């Protein structure tokens, strides 16, 4: 899996490409931990799933840990542009009920607001 991180103003975009399976979940989780370990942490993080082909249960766990890390840091957290198969996994697992998911990056950027500490 390929992970690219880009700062777009106050929003940090994490672009995922490939398969977020058991082997890739650890690398994704470590990237997110490094991101939130920065001082100061980013005000908002959006995970762009437009090129994410597959997510396993270990990947869902990594998303949950990322959302919790964002909450601890006082950062907004959202996902966008999930492929239909990936979105179905989020829907069936109930993750779409607990995470902010937007149809595209522009919509996510417009709706994400950093929570006040």
Regions found by a protein language model. Give the residues of each.
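Glycine-centered tight turns that cap/initiate beta-strands
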Residues: 10, 95-98, 104
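Short beta-strand/loop segment at the start of cytosolic alpha/beta domains
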Residues: 1-15
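Conserved catalytic submotifs in the C-terminal HATPase_c
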Residues: 8-9, 50, 82, 106
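General small-molecule cofactor/ligand-binding pocket signal
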Residues: 4-6, 80, 102
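Amphipathic alpha-helical interaction surfaces in cytosolic regulatory modules
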Residues: 22-99
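A charged, well-structured terminal subsegment
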Residues: 100-117
């Amino acid at each position: 899996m390929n992970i690219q991180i880009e700062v777009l103003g106050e929003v940090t975009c994490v672009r995922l490409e490939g398969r977020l399976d058991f082997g890739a979940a650890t690398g994704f989780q470590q990237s997110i931990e490094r991101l939130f370990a920065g001082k100061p942490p980013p005000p908002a993080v959006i995970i762009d799933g437009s090129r994410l082909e597959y997510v396993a249960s270990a990947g869902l766990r990594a998303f949950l840990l990322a959302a919790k890390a964002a909450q601890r840091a006082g950062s907004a957290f959202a996902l966008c542009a999930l492929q239909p198969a990936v979105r179905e996994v989020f829907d069936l697992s109930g993750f779409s009920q607990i995470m902010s998911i937007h149809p595209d990056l522009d919509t996510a950027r417009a709706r994400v607001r950093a929570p006040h500490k």
